[in-house]
């Protein structure tokens, strides 16, 4: 009796091992990965084979399991890609938003550039630097010597300053001291002045201590004082300051004076 019991136990153990070798997986659990989102056909799965009672070899079973696992991995990858694409499109991050801001590629105009452009225009229109081949050079030199003799000048007048002020007093409408028409040419003269002009007009001690902007202001003030004296002198002595133009106010003053001198002769 005892021997039959041992034989039964041995048969059960052998049968259990045989079943395990045939299918190491637990067939009681459902194949969730096989019944997939992509709608895979479950008739090719090992579970279906066992349910239908079909006989199959171990090699065939391994082939079927590998096929099922590979298809499931592809399906999951495709589903993951679709979900990721959907989430990106909903979130608005699928495309990098293009910036609508327009970048101005043209260089900004600096103050130095504007000043340089303005200076070039002023120099073209008002630069009175006397050239050696200027046909009016003798006239300019003569008027320069005349202006140097005017008393009370704030500093020794340069030839350039004399030429600029000579043109100012001989305009069709003469520039009176302190007016806007007077300020503009003197301001242009100050803007294109060189360091030597400051040295000629300003005190050396003041130039060592004062900043450049203060030196410009002081020089501009001295130009105003100088022109006021030139204006007074030329209207008192028009023949010494005229440029012999009929439109010159000084020339008109000379003609008026000559007419007044001739009137008594006609009366007699």
Swiss-Prot record:
What does the similarity note say?
Answer: Belongs to the RxLR effector family.
According to its UniProt entry, the function of this protein is described as: Secreted effector that completely suppresses the host cell death induced by cell death-inducing proteins.
Name the UniProt record assigns to this protein: Secreted RxLR effector protein 6
Provide a GO CC annotation, any one: host cell cytoplasm
**Key word Signal present:** yes
Q: Which UniProt keywords apply?
A: Host cytoplasm, Host nucleus, Secreted, Signal, Virulence
According to the record, the signal peptide region is: 1-19
Q: Where is the composition biased (Polar residues)?
A: 107-123
Give the species this sequence originates from: Plasmopara viticola (Downy mildew of grapevine)
List the top taxonomic levels of the source: Eukaryota, Sar, Stramenopiles, Oomycota, Peronosporales
Q: Where is this motif: RxLR-dEER?
A: 48-63
* Domain writeup: The RxLR-dEER motif acts to carry the protein into the host cell cytoplasm through binding to cell surface phosphatidylinositol-3-phosphate.
Q: Where in the cell is it found?
A: Secreted; Host nucleus; Host cytoplasm
- Does the UniProt entry include the keyword Manganese? no
């Amino acid at each position: 009796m005892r021997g039959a019991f041992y034989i039964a136990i041995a048969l059960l153990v052998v049968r259990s091992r045989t079943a395990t070798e045939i299918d190491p997986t637990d067939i009681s659990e459902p194949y969730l990965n096989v019944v997939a989102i992509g709608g895979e056909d479950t008739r090719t799965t090992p579970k279906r084979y066992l349910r239908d009672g079909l006989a199959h070899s171990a090699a065939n079973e391994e082939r079927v399991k590998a096929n099922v696992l590979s298809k499931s991995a592809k399906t999951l990858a495709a589903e993951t890609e679709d979900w990721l694409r959907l989430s990106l499109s909903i979130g608005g991050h699928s495309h990098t938003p293009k910036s609508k801001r327009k970048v101005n590629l043209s260089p900004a105009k600096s103050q130095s550039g504007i000043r340089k452009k303005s200076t070039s225009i002023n120099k073209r229109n008002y630069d009175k630097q006397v050239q050696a081949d200027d046909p009016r050079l003798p006239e300019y030199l003569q008027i320069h010597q005349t202006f140097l003799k005017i008393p009370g000048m704030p500093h020794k007048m340069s030839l350039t300053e004399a030429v600029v002020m000579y043109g100012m007093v001989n305009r069709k409408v003469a520039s009176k001291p302190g007016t806007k028409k007077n300020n503009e040419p003197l301001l242009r003269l100050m803007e294109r002045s060189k360091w030597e002009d400051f040295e000629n007009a300003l005190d050396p001690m003041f130039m060592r201590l004062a900043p450049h902007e203060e030196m410009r202001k002081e020089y501009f003030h001295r130009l105003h004082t100088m022109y006021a004296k030139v204006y007074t002198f030329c209207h008192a002595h028009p023949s010494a300051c005229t440029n012999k133009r009929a439109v010159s106010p000084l020339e008109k003053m000379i003609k008026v004076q000559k007419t007044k001198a001739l009137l008594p002769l006609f009366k007699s």
